[in-house]
Amino acid sequence: MSDRGGIFAGDDPFAIARSWLAEAERTEPNDANAMALATVDADGLPDARMVLLKDIEGGAADGSFVFYTNYESAKGVEIEATGVAAFVMHWKSLRRQIRVRGHVTRVEPELADAYYASRPLQSRIGAWASRQSRPLASRGALMAEVARLGISLGLNPSRPPHWGGYRIHPVQIEFWADGAFRLHDRFRWTKSSYQGENSALRDEGQEVPQSLWQVCRLSP
């Protein structure tokens, strides 16, 4: 019998993630949507940085986590090469965290356009001016480029082709809550219905699992 209840209860990990994030937005002093995004470079070395989660889409069957960035940045190049990423969100005020691993795809251009248009004008110009992750002579050089582009692009710049969004489609989601004496609670959700695996099962005449996610309590 499962002892998964309280803040861990439910049959949709994306609903749980939304609930935790909403609670964190009421208790964290700033950037409750900050997440440490991990990728792997061409040499197999891990890389990590903080980015902002902008949406939790869908539900158990098709959910994803969305963020936006420069496609030509280090993280963009690494994601394009590997198609995978992981992230962790940790909230000190709640003493909880969420870990996610999965495959990554680009969001639709129309969605990226809409989000880009919602940003402050200076941020939109900055997306054009910054050659993210590449060497920069000085901050003065960057601000000069921002000023130049501010004049040439006007008040309604279009989205740069090198800037847009990514969706992380999880294969694993772990929910963690602090416990006394380091006896934490951890529940790992693992997606059990990979399309390739299901196709192989169907080809062999075997039954395809009906449960989309398998949930396992982990030792702290």
From Swiss-Prot:
Cofactor(s), by name: FMN
Binding site for FMN: R49, M50, V51, L52, L53, K54, Y68, T69, K75, Q97, Q132, S133, W176, R186
Signal peptide start-end: none
Biological-process GO terms, alphabetical: pyridoxine biosynthetic process
Claim: Magnesium is one of the keywords in the record: no
Pathway as given in its UniProt record: Cofactor metabolism; pyridoxal 5'-phosphate salvage; pyridoxal 5'-phosphate from pyridoxamine 5'-phosphate: step 1/1; Cofactor metabolism; pyridoxal 5'-phosphate salvage; pyridoxal 5'-phosphate from pyridoxine 5'-phosphate: step 1/1
Keyword annotations from UniProtKB, A to Z: Flavoprotein, FMN, Oxidoreductase, Pyridoxine biosynthesis
EC number annotated for this UniProt entry: 1.4.3.5
Pfam families associated with the record: PNP_phzG_C, PNPOx_N
Binding site for substrate: K54, Y115, R119, S123, R182, L183, H184
Keyword Flavoprotein attributed: yes
MF (Gene Ontology): FMN binding; pyridoxamine phosphate oxidase activity
Catalytic activity: pyridoxamine 5'-phosphate + O2 + H2O = pyridoxal 5'-phosphate + H2O2 + NH4(+); pyridoxine 5'-phosphate + O2 = pyridoxal 5'-phosphate + H2O2
Cofactor note: Binds 1 FMN per subunit.
Family, similarity comment: Belongs to the pyridoxamine 5'-phosphate oxidase family.
Family annotation (PANTHER family): PYRIDOXINE-5'-PHOSPHATE OXIDASE, PYRIDOXINE-5-PHOSPHATE OXIDASE
Role noted for this protein: Catalyzes the oxidation of either pyridoxine 5'-phosphate (PNP) or pyridoxamine 5'-phosphate (PMP) into pyridoxal 5'-phosphate (PLP).
Oligomer and partners: Homodimer.
Protein's name according to its UniProt entry: Pyridoxine/pyridoxamine 5'-phosphate oxidase
Organism of provenance: Paracoccus denitrificans (strain Pd 1222)
Source species taxonomy: Bacteria, Pseudomonadati, Pseudomonadota, Alphaproteobacteria, Rhodobacterales
